[in-house]
Amino acid sequence: MCEVNHHLLKIVNDMGLDLIFTDMDRSGIYFADEKVIFLSDKLLENNSDFEISHELGHCIKKHEELSAYYNATDFSRRKLEFEANRIAIEILLFIWSNEYDFEREQLNAVKFMEYYNIPWNLESCVRESMLNYG
């Protein structure tokens, strides 16, 4: 069982959100009205930091205000999901940089993605974020 990163928990708490792991089919969902992020308890078996950061991305960008747009087309849903993924990567890069002493040139996309269980289809986004980091 993996624990949630304490820096990430601080961000969740500072934003006034609750984080609840429960038995559910989807990986995670953010409910703005209740200020709660629900995550599948199956995520506790591995590092769940990416999923938490992804849901924080929806919160930060106030995607709940765009629910009609989100549900309008597959394209609009994918666009908002990608935006949440990008924010998740940026949050995790910030945490990574605060936990490990390294030079920018030492950033390794593969190690970073493996550590945080970031889906491989986001590799180009991770690499771009690393280039723009700092």
Model regions and ranges:
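Active-site hotspot residues in diverse enzymes, especially metal/ion-binding acidic/histidine motifs
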Residues: 1-134
